[in-house]
């Protein structure tokens, strides 16, 4: 048959084998997919898959829990579909691939929702009860959407960080790391959000541009004798006029808390004589800064930063209020730069990490640190001049007072990247507060008399033992761990797991039986949830000591919640499903894979690594996979304000979840994932091509029974053996990609296979044999044998990403056979072995190149009007060498490969030549097969049939060997 498209023929006295299938051409995905979801739920498909893999090696993809707040967005869909594809691909490879979905349930966003719905000031217990109910409802909504995407997992038994057992085990994990010596309490600057009223984790901070007042402030000379010595000048010369050391800052609100100044020990500093007085600036900044100050000046002396160490200066507000009558010493700091500003940094230890470290290193006690900013961002009422003002409102007033003091040299608006709360989108600050920390560089308790590496050392070593997909994630996580500060474990919140400590009222010391008491609290939490801590009377546990202690009111960082799920879930609540003793014995890393967005290098990947390093001394995972963020077709970040967000629910309802899955699978997740209406239209077209190929395969297998019609590969036609060999080669590539968590190459190769290898060649050639040879002929059954094997292999390749379609096709393909009732309990298909497969592949590759040249020449003749269909043509090919031999080996079957009515081969003048001559056939057209043949009408009883069709219908049937 030709490649012409024909309407379904009316009944003919010369019928062809045109079969139909119950697999429809139109996917009608929005309607059919929910039916599949319900069917999978009803038959408990995930349980059936687990039962089918019982005893097999486990593969654990541990779910990074989404937050139980709001509807899922396209980023959630990407994440869950990627996980689902991996779990299904591993399951089809024969592994017991386990997927327990989870949810992150505690934290500020839910507290905010409760506050919005019920107002502020609720008792803690009431907040917790309402938060638990709210999270439960959100989880139900999100679960429906995740299942709608075709994601299989233990949806009936997900893990929730708010489950009582998980909350209790989290407390036990805290107890363990305390016993190991990682946890301490201290005053440190931490990320602080005024709107949250709490410390923030590093992962809860984002950076946005902010406009601030940039100021250059002079600290008046106080110890001129020491300055004179440093600059090798006389005291009289320095006392002749006023002088200042000048700092530059973009946080005027920190000036009232200044306690020191920092210079770089190796930088050269200049004493500059100006009409206003002496200024001390970094030498390389003098020219630029004088321009800014609109001053002329001359350098009269220079010295090194080291020579200025410990020299003190007056606070710039000292003249305005005696409350600032203090001196600020110079401390040396390697972090001081001369890229911008004056080369001198003002230090407010309560509001800067480096400031704090520098001042502490020089002997400043916690008690001495000045910290007037309260948790709501307002200065304490006792602060001179600015008490009661918010720090942002105080900025312009501070500038006014500095100007009045005569110590302001410049002020202007300055745009810079600044820290913001990821929830409230409001600016945050560093603020020194008393918090509980996990120390990155503290020395843990010795084990068996041996020193234990620090947390930082253990975590960095763990990174080296972890596989990263893509590989750049390794360096990214390494840099974050190498440079991070101590982990602030405590939060000042209500809806969170309590740091259930008893603290001495006078000394602040922990109760000496803290580890034992934590276990007692954990048992109560296991029965009643974190609410048990709120209702607990200290006397119940402390007896007569109760009056000496108070309950700690801090909660654990929510990143500790999700970061300990390797302990609370894999080794805890879902141990029966997820725990693998052999993996524990091997190296203790129980999760084969953690998979999340690239932001989780500073989030879940990070916190999980730190907690596992403290608990076990190794990472909880063997591999980390990172995917990019979704952007629109122009590469812009998804934003409601821009109006470019895409709803997975809308796509599923309009196009089908299968389109989302195919889009995810076909996109390189290692970078940004672009999505738009235009991109989705292309995905739909791609889906249709794959579906049409499947429909053709299933249609032509509708009268095939493998138990009756199977033939050994040696009895197939040569082109059938080639097609199966090609399928086998592709399958090896597909499975290799799946092993490496690569999906877009699989989709690309499947599309090429469908459009070029099958639709553009093999199936195109096969149509004549399938349609025109006798229904039960060996030639036709051989073709169906090949299609049977190709279809079964292809359905398994598709199943991880086109899950609904593969399952739908499987029901048609496997109906009434001994196959499993779902494709997901089967495994990748083992294709029959084809003898001399490599030789066949090479030979047919050459033949396809010849066919491409013939098609090109046929098209040229068609354009000229000499022929219509390619079957109106007869072709002569002149070739040499192996190509000539390959063409000649096909004998009369060559015309079927070329889709022409006749084909002859002759030697070319030169061995490497390939010459194609096309002529229009002068013969009559067979009514049935449409070939133009000399023997049409040779049987007067059937004057419109060629001899081949006459034989196939009424005689012994034609014989074919090759195609």
From Swiss-Prot:
Superkingdom in the source lineage: Bacteria
Compartment list: Cytoplasm
Transmembrane found in the keyword field: no
Amino acids binding ATP: 640
Aminoacyl-tRNA synthetase listed as a keyword: yes
CDD domains per the UniProt record, alphabetical: Anticodon_Ia_Ile_BEm, IleRS_core
A GO molecular function held by the record: aminoacyl-tRNA deacylase activity
Root EC class: ligase
Motif 'KMSKS' region mapped to chain: 637-641
Necessary cofactors: Zn(2+)
Keywords: Aminoacyl-tRNA synthetase, ATP-binding, Cytoplasm, Ligase, Metal-binding, Nucleotide-binding, Protein biosynthesis, Zinc
Cofactor binding notes: Binds 1 zinc ion per subunit.
Binding site for Zn(2+): 926, 929, 946, 949
Signal peptide: none
Alphabetical GO biological process terms: isoleucyl-tRNA aminoacylation
Family matches, as Gene3D superfamilies: 1.10.730.20, HUPs (3.40.50.620), Valyl/Leucyl/Isoleucyl-tRNA synthetase, editing domain (3.90.740.10)
GO cellular component: cytosol
Chain positions of motif 'HIGH' region: 66-76
PANTHER family in alphabetical order: ISOLEUCINE--TRNA LIGASE, MITOCHONDRIAL, SOLEUCYL-TRNA SYNTHETASE
Function: Catalyzes the attachment of isoleucine to tRNA(Ile). As IleRS can inadvertently accommodate and process structurally similar amino acids such as valine, to avoid such errors it has two additional distinct tRNA(Ile)-dependent editing activities. One activity is designated as 'pretransfer' editing and involves the hydrolysis of activated Val-AMP. The other activity is designated 'posttransfer' editing and involves deacylation of mischarged Val-tRNA(Ile).
Domain free text: IleRS has two distinct active sites: one for aminoacylation and one for editing. The misactivated valine is translocated from the active site to the editing site, which sterically excludes the correctly activated isoleucine. The single editing site contains two valyl binding pockets, one specific for each substrate (Val-AMP or Val-tRNA(Ile)).
HAMAP family, per database record: Ile_tRNA_synth_type1
Protein name (Swiss-Prot/TrEMBL): Isoleucine--tRNA ligase
The organism of origin for this protein: Cupriavidus pinatubonensis (strain JMP 134 / LMG 1197)
Gene assigned in the entry: ileS
């Amino acid at each position: 048959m030709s490649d012409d498209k024909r309407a379904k023929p009316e009944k003919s006295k010369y019928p062809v084998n045109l079969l139909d299938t119950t697999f429809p051409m139109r996917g009608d995905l929005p309607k059919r997919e929910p039916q599949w979801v319900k069917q999978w739920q009803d038959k408990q498909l995930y349980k059936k898959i687990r039962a089918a893999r019982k005893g097999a090696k486990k593969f654990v993809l541990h779910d990074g829990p989404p937050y139980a707040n709001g509807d899922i967005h396209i980023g959630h869909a990407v994440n869950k579909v990627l996980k689902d594809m991996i779990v299904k691909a591993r399951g089809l490879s024969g592994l017991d691939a386990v997927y327990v979905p989870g949810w992150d349930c505690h934290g500020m966003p839910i507290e905010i929702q409760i506050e919005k719905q019920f107002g502020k000031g609720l008792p803690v217990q009431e907040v917790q009860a309402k938060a638990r109910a709210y999270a439960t409802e959100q989880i139900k909504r999100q679960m429906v959407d995740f299942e709608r995407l075709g994601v299989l997992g233990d949806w009936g038994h997900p893990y929730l960080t708010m489950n009582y057992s998980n909350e209790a085990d989290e407390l036990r994990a805290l107890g363990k790391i305390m016993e190991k010596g990682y946890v301490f309490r201290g005053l440190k600057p931490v990320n602080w959000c005024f709107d949250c009223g709490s410390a923030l984790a590093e992962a809860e901070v984002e950076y946005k541009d902010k406009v601030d007042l940039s100021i250059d402030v002079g600290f008046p000379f106080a110890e001129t004798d020491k300055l004179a010595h440093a600059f090798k000048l006389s005291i009289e010369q320095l006392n002749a006029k006023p002088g200042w050391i000048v700092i530059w800052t973009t946080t005027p609100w920190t000036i009232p808390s200044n306690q020191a100044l920092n210079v770089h020990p190796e930088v050269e500093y200049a004493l500059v004589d100006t009409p206003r007085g002496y200024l001390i600036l970094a030498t390389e900044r003098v020219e630029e800064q004088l321009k800014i100050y609109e001053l002329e000046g001359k350098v009269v002396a220079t010295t090194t930063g080291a020579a200025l160490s410990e020299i003190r200066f007056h606070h710039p507000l000292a003249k305005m209020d005696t409350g600032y009558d203090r001196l600020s010493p110079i401390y040396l700091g390697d972090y001081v730069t001369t890229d911008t500003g004056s080369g001198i940094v003002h230090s407010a230890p309560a509001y800067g990490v480096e400031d704090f470290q520098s001042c502490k290193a020089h002997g400043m006690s916690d008690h001495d640190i000045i910290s007037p900013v309260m948790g709501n961002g307002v200065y304490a009422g006792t602060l001179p001049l600015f008490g009661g003002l918010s720090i942002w409102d105080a900025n312009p007033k501070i500038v006014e007072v500095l100007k009045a003091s005569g110590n302001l040299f410049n002020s202007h608006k300055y745009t810079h990247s600044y820290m913001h709360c990821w929830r409230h989108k409001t600016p945050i600050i560093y603020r020194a507060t008393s918090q509980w920390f996990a120390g990155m560089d503290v020395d843990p308790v010795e084990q068996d008399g041996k020193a234990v590496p620090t947390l930082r050392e253990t975590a960095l070593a763990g990174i080296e033992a972890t596989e990263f997909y893509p590989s750049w994630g390794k360096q990214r996580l390494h840099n974050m761990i190498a440079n991070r500060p101590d982990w602030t474990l405590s939060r000042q919140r209500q809806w969170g797991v309590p740091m259930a400590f008893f603290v001495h009222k006078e000394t602040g010391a922990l109760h000496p039986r803290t580890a034992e008491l934590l276990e007692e609290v954990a048992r109560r939490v296991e029965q009643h949830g974190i609410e048990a801590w709120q209702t607990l009377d200290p006397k119940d546990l402390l007896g007569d000591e109760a009056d000496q202690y108070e309950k700690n009111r801090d909660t654990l960082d929510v990143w500790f919640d999700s970061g300990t799920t390797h302990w609370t879930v894999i080794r805890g609540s879902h141990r029966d499903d997820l725990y693998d003793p052999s993996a524990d014995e091997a190296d203790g890393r129980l999760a084969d894979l953690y998979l999340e967005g690239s932001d989780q290098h500073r989030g879940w990947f990070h916190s999980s690594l730190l907690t596992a390093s403290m608990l076990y001394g190794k990472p909880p995972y063997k591999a980390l996979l990172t995917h990019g963020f979704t952007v629109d077709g122009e590469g812009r970040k998804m934003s409601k304000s821009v109006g470019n967000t895409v709803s997975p629910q809308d796509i599923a309802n309009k196009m089908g979840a299968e389109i989302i899955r195919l889009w995810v699978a076909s996109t390189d997740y290692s970078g940004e994932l672009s999505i738009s209406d235009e991109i989705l239209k292309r995905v739909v077209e791609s889906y249709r091509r794959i579906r049409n190929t499947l429909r053709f395969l299933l249609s032509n297998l509708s009268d095939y029974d493998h138990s009756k019609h199977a033939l050994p590969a040696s009895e197939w036609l040569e082109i059938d053996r080639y097609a199966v060999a090609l399928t086998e080669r592709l399958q090896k590539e597909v499975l290799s990609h799946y092993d490496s968590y690569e999906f877009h190459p699989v989709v690309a190769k499947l599309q090429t296979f469908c459009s070029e290898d099958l639709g553009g060649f093999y199936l195109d050639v096969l149509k004549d044999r399938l349609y025109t040879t006798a229904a039960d002929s060996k030639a036709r059954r051989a073709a169906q044998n090949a299609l049977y094997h190709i279809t079964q292999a292809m359905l398994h390749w598709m199943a991880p990403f086109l899950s609904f379609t593969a399952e739908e096709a499987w029901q048609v393909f496997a109906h009434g056979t001994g196959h499993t009732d779902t494709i997901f309990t089967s495994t990748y298909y083992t294709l029959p072995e084809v003898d001399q497969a490599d030789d066949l592949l090479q030979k047919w590759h050459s033949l396809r190149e010849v066919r491409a040249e013939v098609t090109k020449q046929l098209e040229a003749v068609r354009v000229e009007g000499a022929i219509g269909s390619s079957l109106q043509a007869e072709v002569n090919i002149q070739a040499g060498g192996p190509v000539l031999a390959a063409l000649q080996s096909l004998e009369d079957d060559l015309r079927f490969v070329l889709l022409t009515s006749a084909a002859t081969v002759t030697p070319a003048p030169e061995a490497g030549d390939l010459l194609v001559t096309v002529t229009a056939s002068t013969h009559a057209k067979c009514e049935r097969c449409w070939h133009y043949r000399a023997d049409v009408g040779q049987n007067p009883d059937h004057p419109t049939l060629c001899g081949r069709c006459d034989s196939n219908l009424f005689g012994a049937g034609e014989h074919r060997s090759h195609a």
